[in-house]
Regions:
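Short, small-residue-biased leader/transition segments that mark boundaries at the very start
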Residues: 2-6, 194
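Short charge-dense sequence patches
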Residues: 1, 22-32, 108-119
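Domain-terminus/edge residues, biased toward the C-terminal soluble/receptor-binding domains
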Residues: 49, 53, 65-192
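Active-site-adjacent helix/loop patches that line small-molecule binding or acyl-intermediate pockets
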Residues: 7-96
Length: 194
């Protein structure tokens, strides 16, 4: 059995879609993949992911009967993940290596290299689901998520995500209005004891 530190398992999972590293992390966190999957389903319910049911921790669905989700639910999960900014230390890696350079990693999310502001997030491909992607990008103070499910090819999923993100950045922005404090008058409050 080969030893690998948690940081490298996270990197292998986020960058290279290493299912063995994903299972090892699940077992480390929860004791078993089954318990981890149960925790994932509980968390999905807490996040309002009404169309999601996990059967494993990898996303592989060839033998899974009811491993399902929706684009909306993936966006909810992605938004929650982005609250933990340190994840971007892994999801923005283009190329890296493990085991002292013996194992090379190239990010399965090609947008990391080719799309300005990409912060991640994750690709997935199975025969049932097709080529999928949760793409996240930030420009100025605007952070967007584009989810593509069921694409026929990897290239098409990236093109669809780029189109959605470009549209979002062209049409939306986070704006904080500047208000002159002197323009706001005094307010008198009366407290009534009942």
């Amino acid at each position: 059995q080969r030893q690998m530190c948690i940081r490298d398992r996270l990197k292998a999972t986020a960058v290279g879609s290493a299912n063995d590293a994903c299972v090892a992390l699940a077992e480390l966190l929860a004791g078993s993949e089954e318990v981890f999957v149960s925790m994932c389903n509980e968390r999905a319910a807490q996040l309002g992911m009404k169309d999601t049911h996990f059967e494993n921790c990898t996303g592989l669905d060839d033998s899974a009967q009811n491993h399902v989700t929706s684009a909306y639910d993936i966006a909810l999960m992605s938004a929650e993940l982005l609250k933990h900014e340190q994840i971007q230390n892994y999801t923005t890696i283009w190329m890296d290596s493990l085991r002292g350079g013996k194992t090379e990693l190239v990010n399965t999310n090609k947008m990391v290299r080719f799309f300005k502001g990409t912060t991640g997030l994750k690709t997935g491909t199975t025969s049932k689901a097709g080529h999928c992607l949760s793409a996240t990008a930030k420009r100025d103070s605007t952070h967007l998520i584009a989810v593509v499910l069921g694409s026929d090819t990897g290239a098409l999923r990236f093109e669809a995500a780029k189109a959605m993100l470009n549209w979002g950045f062209a049409n939306w922005a986070v704006v904080t209005p500047k208000v002159d404090a002197s323009a706001i008058g005094d307010v008198t409050l009366s407290l009534i004891h009942i």
